């Protein structure tokens, strides 16, 4: 099965299934001498971890990460870092009744068609459980970015259904289970989640992620543009159906005179481009938005077929998120951090000696 790795200089390869023995990943390209402990990774894993609030799946996984290699006496050695998380709260019996039925809106049908078989227990490899390892690897990238370059990557929930959340206060993001920066919207979000739980339905969401203090010059035209690699990485997250960089699709209705980011001796006057021009970072904040579909694992009956092609009805039982976008915030941060670290290492290798005299802000 191909497609399990991302990155060139900083490369992450994940393995494992939702109901398998464990999840793991190999992280290549981490420079030596970076202080790193399991606690450095655990913080973000705890933010993504299931069963932490009544608004997410009640599958309870401790997600305790183990560093197997690549770290000695508390610092990275420059060799491959092996990471492992054991699965401890699988309930495979919840899926026995649907092993021969394709859940509508899931990867069951396409996996069966592609491989001729599938792990029906919780979606197997297609499950968002896999993203735990992305978050662990992303935590390494986030620490490197912050420590070596002063780059901070953080995200927030910007919309669930019709409830929009403005970026009013970064501090609020970690103070509520929605990762919402707008305290005035918490009651509306709570009411929406309660209604969905009662109805047995789900809802979509929008997540925003921002990288601050990104150096100028990251990105490799033309096919490895920074925004192209970010879109690739963010679109690879389960349930993501759309990615915007900067103003994204809003540029369709704008004139060039208002959309361009004008430059003065003091710097850029706006950031409609989301910190990327011509596929290369401009030194401004890099801004991306993700649209996540509502999960199809719901109690509302839906039409489908079985492996014999016979019509049947599906009601998904088990433990699922009414809104997968909530736990996607640390995943989006991780994927942006992985891409930025990869491009920083690539920039250092190719253009580390370049010394442009053009002003930077």
Swiss-Prot record:
It comes from Pectobacterium atrosepticum (strain SCRI 1043 / ATCC BAA-672) (Erwinia carotovora subsp. atroseptica). Reduced FMN (FMNH(2)). The gene is aroC. Belongs to the chorismate synthase family. InterPro entries: Chorismate_synth, Chorismate_synth_AroC_sf, Chorismate_synthase_CS. SUPFAM superfamilies: Chorismate synthase, AroC. It catalyses: 5-O-(1-carboxyvinyl)-3-phosphoshikimate = chorismate + phosphate. Keywords: Amino-acid biosynthesis, Aromatic amino acid biosynthesis, FAD, Flavoprotein, FMN, Lyase, NADP. Pathway: Metabolic intermediate biosynthesis; chorismate biosynthesis; chorismate from D-erythrose 4-phosphate and phosphoenolpyruvate: step 7/7. FMN binds at residues 125-127, 238-239, 278, 293-297, 319. One of its GO terms (cellular component) is cytosol. The keyword Amino-acid biosynthesis applies. One of its GO terms (molecular function) is chorismate synthase activity. The keyword Flavoprotein applies. It is an enzyme of class 4 (lyase). This is Chorismate synthase. NADP(+) binds at residues 48, 54. It holds the Pfam family Chorismate_synt.
């Amino acid at each position: 099965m191909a497609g399990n790795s991302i990155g060139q200089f900083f490369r992450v390869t994940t393995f494992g299934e939702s109901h398998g023995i464990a999840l793991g990943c190999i992280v290549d390209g981490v420079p030596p001498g970076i202080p790193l402990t399991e606690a450095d990774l655990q913080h973000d894993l705890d933010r993504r971890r299931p069963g932490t609030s009544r608004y997410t799946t009640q599958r309870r996984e401790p997600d305790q990460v183990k560093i197997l290699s690549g770290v000695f006496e508390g610092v990275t050695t420059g060799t491959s870092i092996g990471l492992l998380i054991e699965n401890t709260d699988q309930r495979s019996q919840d899926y026995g009744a649907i092993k021969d039925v394709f859940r509508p809106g899931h990867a069951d049908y396409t996996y069966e068609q592609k491989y001729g078989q599938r792990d029906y227990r919780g979606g197997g490899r297609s499950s968002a459980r896999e993203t735990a390892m992305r978050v662990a690897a992303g935590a390494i990238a986030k620490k490197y970015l912050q420590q070596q370059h002063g780059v901070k990557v953080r995200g927030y929930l910007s919309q669930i259904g019709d409830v929009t959340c403005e970026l009013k206060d970064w501090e609020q993001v970690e103070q509520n289970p929605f990762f919402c920066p707008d305290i005035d919207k918490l009651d509306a979000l709570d009411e929406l989640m309660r209604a969905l739980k009662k109805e047995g339905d789900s809802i979509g969401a929008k997540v925003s992620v921002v990288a601050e203090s990104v150096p100028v010059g990251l990105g490799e035209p033309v096919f490895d543009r920074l925004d192209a690699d970010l879109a690739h990485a963010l679109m690879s997250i389960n349930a993501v159906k759309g990615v915007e960089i900067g103003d994204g699709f809003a540029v369709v209705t704008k004139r060039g005179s208002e959309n361009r980011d004008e430059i003065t001796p003091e710097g850029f006057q706006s950031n409609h481009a989301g910190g990327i021009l011509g596929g290369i970072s401009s030194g401004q904040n890099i801004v991306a938005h993700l649209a996540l579909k509502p999960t199809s694992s719901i109690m509302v009956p839906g039409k489908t077929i079985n492996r014999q092609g016979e019509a049947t009805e599906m009601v998904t039982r088990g433990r699922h998120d009414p809104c997968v976008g909530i736990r996607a915030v640390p995943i989006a941060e991780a994927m942006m951090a992985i891409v930025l670290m990869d491009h920083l290492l690539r920039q250092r290798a190719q253009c580390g000696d370049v010394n442009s005299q053009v002003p930077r802000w």
